[in-house]
């Protein structure tokens, strides 16, 4: 999920999706062959499809869909808010426990407020049920392209935050969607009342009136914000 820029400035605007908020995943029953580990004969991974360095978790398989190997997914962001990555990417990496598999998706589409898809090699309902609980990753490079001055949250997490005077304010630890716009949760080293080190926190709205530049190459966000706010 992500938010919207409610200011007039175009710079600093975030699209309506980005980093993904994990949703609860239904746990498969402990017994039953169809609910066990991912079927290694159905979904395979080979050296040419090793786990990508830019893998981002975008959803999870929650159930089978129909009888022909389709699966139902909970996207960590809804369609148009991150679920688009599930719809666009055709190469998926699945992780269930310690086991990782690659799947070439033949079809993916919206179904109500969920995404349903057909991973290649998933031939029937039992095969699909075996995938239940698997976390779904795609390459960051397979995310849909964004317009200029739009950013995925996943690309903002970890950036340094400085103000226009060059004062370091901390590092983006998380992004929050308050329903109106996005908020950067910025962490910085601080000292508690007992004199012990602790982690301080700043909440800075990710809107154009405060965010003056997002310099991804430099690894920083420049804001109109004072250290004592």
UniProtKB/Swiss-Prot annotation:
Keywords: Chaperone, Cytoplasm, Ribosome biogenesis, rRNA processing. The keyword Iron does not apply. InterPro entries: PRC_barrel-like_sf (IPR011033), PRC_RimM (IPR056792), RimM (IPR011961), RimM_N (IPR002676), RimM_N_sf (IPR036976), Transl_B-barrel_sf (IPR009000). Residues 148-229 form the PRC barrel domain. Binds ribosomal protein uS19. Residues 1-21 are annotated as: Disordered. GO terms for biological process: ribosomal small subunit biogenesis; rRNA processing. This is Ribosome maturation factor RimM. The PRC barrel domain binds ribosomal protein uS19. GO terms for cellular component: cytoplasm; ribosome. Signal peptide: none annotated. It comes from Burkholderia pseudomallei (strain 1106a). The keyword Phosphoprotein does not apply. It is found in: Cytoplasm. One of its GO terms (molecular function) is ribosome binding. Coiled coil: none annotated. Its main location: cytoplasm. An accessory protein needed during the final step in the assembly of 30S ribosomal subunit, possibly for assembly of the head region. Essential for efficient processing of 16S rRNA. May be needed both before and after RbfA during the maturation of 16S rRNA. It has affinity for free ribosomal 30S subunits but not for 70S ribosomes. Belongs to the RimM family. Pfam families: PRC_RimM (PF24986), RimM (PF01782). PANTHER family: RIBOSOME MATURATION FACTOR RIMM.
């Amino acid at each position: 999920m992500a938010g919207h820029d409610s200011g007039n400035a175009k710079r600093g605007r975030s699209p309506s999706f980005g980093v993904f908020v994990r949703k609860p995943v239904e746990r498969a029953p402990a017994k039953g062959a169809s609910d066990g580990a991912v079927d290694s004969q159905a979904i395979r991974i080979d050296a040419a499809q090793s786990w990508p360095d830019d893998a981002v978790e975008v959803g999870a398989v929650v159930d089978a869909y129909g009888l022909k190997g389709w699966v139902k997914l909970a996207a960590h962001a809804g369609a148009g808010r991150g679920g688009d990555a599930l719809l666009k990417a055709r190469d998926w990496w699945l992780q269930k426990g310690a086991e990782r598999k690659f799947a070439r998706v033949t079809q993916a589409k919206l179904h109500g407020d969920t995404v349903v898809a057909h991973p290649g090699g998933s031939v029937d309902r039992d095969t699909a049920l075996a995938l239940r609980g698997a976390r779904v990753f795609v390459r960051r490079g397979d995310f849909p392209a964004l317009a200029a001055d739009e950013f995925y949250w996943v690309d903002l997490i970890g950036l340094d935050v400085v103000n226009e005077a060059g004062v370091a304010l901390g590092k983006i630890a998380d992004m929050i969607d308050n329903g109106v716009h996005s908020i950067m949760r910025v962490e910085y080293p601080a000292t508690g009342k007992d004199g012990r080190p602790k982690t301080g926190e700043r909440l800075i709205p990710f809107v154009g009136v405060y965010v003056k530049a997002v310099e991804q190459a430099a690894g920083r966000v420049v804001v109109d914000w004072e250290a004592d706010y």
